Amino acid sequence: MPSSPKIKKEDMLQAALELVSKNGYAALNIKAVARELGCSTAPISWQFGGMDGLRAELIPFAEQYVEDKYYSRNENELATFEQKGKGTIDLALENPNLFRFLYTGERSQLLSTGFELQTNNPDVANVYQKMAELLGITPKQVMDFAMTMMVYTQGIGTLIASGIVKDTKENMYRMLHNTGMTYLKGLGVKDSTLWDLSGGDRSDESSSNG
């Protein structure tokens, strides 16, 4: 047995990620990954110790891929939070198999870099505090808002990835934005504050006024 595999671990994970993206989670196995790489199963088994090990390491690898491709930071915490929601919609539209791998079915897991509420994480708690200060509400209200939007966005994403809902990206973005703005208004956030923080996007008003 060689002391180290000739094929890099990252290449194996990339091949597994592409396999899931193309054919779905059910197609993921060591033989299929080996076929993608044009090698035997030995180096993959050596690297991960079997399918359980491969799956365990593919999850954070896939999360980082989603973070890099679909999420980006914006000028304030609220805009960054909304971008994560838009990124989740993009993922469901563009890569439904990967969405299902991360969010639904046997391999169900919330993205740790996305909407998951990590209340024991000081960095995340600081984000909620900053959002509360921006919006003029309490951190508890921000957490309730975040959880509501997480459930709403996950629901939209699941319907998209399942092929049940077929609509344009722009309409999905508008639905997400309008729902968030309506919820925040219900918490007493001033219209002027929402206007400033959303960059002047009043799509909710224009759509409701016909």
Feature locations, PLM:
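Basic, helix-initiating cap at the start of DNA-binding domains
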Residues: M1-N23, A27, K31-A32, E36, ...
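Short hydrophobic clusters on alpha-helical segments that form packing/core surfaces
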Residues: M12-V20, A62, V66, T88, ...
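Alpha-helical DNA-contacting segments of helix-turn-helix folds
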Residues: V20, G53-A62, K69, L102, ...
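Short hydrophobic/aromatic patch on the recognition helix
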Residues: L37-F48
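Hydrophobic alpha-helical connector segments
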Residues: E57, Y71-L98, P139, A146-M149
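Amphipathic alpha-helical packing segments from all-alpha helical-bundle domains
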Residues: E67-Y70, Q109-G136, M143-T148, R174-G188
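Short secondary-structure transition hinges
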Residues: D90, E94-L135, T158, V165, ...
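Hydrophobic alpha-helical segments that form the core
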Residues: K140-S162, Y173-T182, L197-E205, N209-G210
